[in-house]
């Protein structure tokens, strides 16, 4: 998927506490080894792992679709693709929502269930 196509993707899963919790489960299973439990990156494991709490450091874009593409297809030289491990697209979208929840509050989308 091209970066332009990724930018056009819209997350069909609302940004809710339930979605964030479901995304957290996927994150804990597949992502903490490189990004750490807090999302701040395990640079002692992967030197160029992205600190997911700082969107300004993202190299492959910060839109929902760009994050989705980075997880599904991989990004850069060290972020592997997870399309064969996370095969359900809804689970990927929940993960995108969880990643957004790691951002500073002023940068997060508004919760839909408040």
Regions found by a protein language model. Name each.
Residues 23-37, 79, 95-99:
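The canonical Cys-X-X-Cys-His
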Residues 16, 40, 87-88:
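Low-complexity, Gly/Pro
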Residues 30, 38, 56, 74-75, ...:
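Conserved functional loop/turn residues at catalytic and ligand-binding sites
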Residues 12-13, 56-57, 81:
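Second-shell loop/turn segments in exported
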Residues 46-51, 70-103, 107-114:
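Axial heme c-ligation environment in periplasmic c-type cytochrome domains
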